[in-house]
Amino acid sequence: MPVALRVVPCLDVDGGRVVKGVNFLDLRDAGDPVELARRYDADGADEITFLDVSASTQGRATTLEMVSATAEQVFVPLTVGGGVRAVADVEALLRAGADKVGVNTAAIARPELLTEIAQHYGNQVLVLSVDARRCPDGVVTDSGFEVTTHGGRTGTGIDAVEWAAEATSRGAGEVLLNSIDADGTTAGFDVEMIEAVRAVVDTPLVASGGAGTVEDFVAAARAGADAVLAASVFHYGTLTISEVKAALRDAGFEVR
């Protein structure tokens, strides 16, 4: 029996509020994270992702109280990311109610962190979060995609596809692939990026960045995504989770 494709709303949280911008800039308020999580759970979300978007740039841990309040309201798995720099941070988030923990910036600086987390908690808990972009002028990688940090503001010169492969070999049980170029644009997922990462990882792949129409979700699934993540189209009522699932089902994909 095929594994059902997951539809995942994303809560980008800053200062206790859900925010959304374009290419991680010009953030505007989108609501209360606890209320939105409750709504998406009721609307049929398969999982919910909670990203503290300013934790890494501000050098602090994710706000545990907000994670706990959100986890108490939902009955689907909750992935939490932002500001995870040590095994102890993972422990704190799991105790607060997270089911999976996303690691991004800290793992780039010290890839061994992925191995340590996987050894402590198992790879099913560990999500590698990759904010990737097409290489700008002056940057060359084999795949044409570069890993960025700090909300897409800082290039690393690291090949995004090679990094995804290394991270899964170190124990990441899932890859959350976010296109910085497409993020918030509603112009469609970066299908080529999804295909490139799909070719090198066997773990579940979550596609993020750019969803605008139900056809975009179908395109991401056809490119090899096991889950499709979106924020603004759900926050602002452009699409419902049910509409996305209906389109995926009509395209021949198994959904819950």
UniProtKB/Swiss-Prot annotation:
Q: Which organism is it from?
A: Beutenbergia cavernae (strain ATCC BAA-8 / DSM 12333 / CCUG 43141 / JCM 11478 / NBRC 16432 / NCIMB 13614 / HKI 0122)
Q: What class of enzyme is it?
A: lyase
Family statement drawn from the similarity comment of this UniProt entry: Belongs to the HisA/HisF family.
Q: What is the lineage of its organism?
A: Bacteria, Bacillati, Actinomycetota, Actinomycetes, Micrococcales
Q: Give the domain of life.
A: Bacteria
Family annotation (SUPFAM superfamilies): Ribulose-phoshate binding barrel
Identification of the protein by name: Imidazole glycerol phosphate synthase subunit HisF
Residues of the active site are D12, D131
Name a GO molecular-function annotation: imidazoleglycerol-phosphate synthase activity
Subcellular location(s): the record lists: Cytoplasm
What Enzyme Commission number(s) apply to this enzyme? 4.3.2.10
Question: Amino-acid biosynthesis among the record's keywords?
Answer: yes
Instruction: Please name the Gene3D superfamilies in this protein's record.
Output: Aldolase class I (3.20.20.70)
**Reactions listed under catalytic activity:** 5-[(5-phospho-1-deoxy-D-ribulos-1-ylimino)methylamino]-1-(5-phospho-beta-D-ribosyl)imidazole-4-carboxamide + L-glutamine = D-erythro-1-(imidazol-4-yl)glycerol 3-phosphate + 5-amino-1-(5-phospho-beta-D-ribosyl)imidazole-4-carboxamide + L-glutamate + H(+)
Keyword list (alphabetical) reads: Amino-acid biosynthesis, Cytoplasm, Histidine biosynthesis, Lyase
- InterPro entries according to UniProt: Aldolase_TIM, His_biosynth, HisF, IGPS_HisA/HisF, RibuloseP-bd_barrel
| Stated role | IGPS catalyzes the conversion of PRFAR and glutamine to IGP, AICAR and glutamate. The HisF subunit catalyzes the cyclization activity that produces IGP and AICAR from PRFAR using the ammonia provided by the HisH subunit.
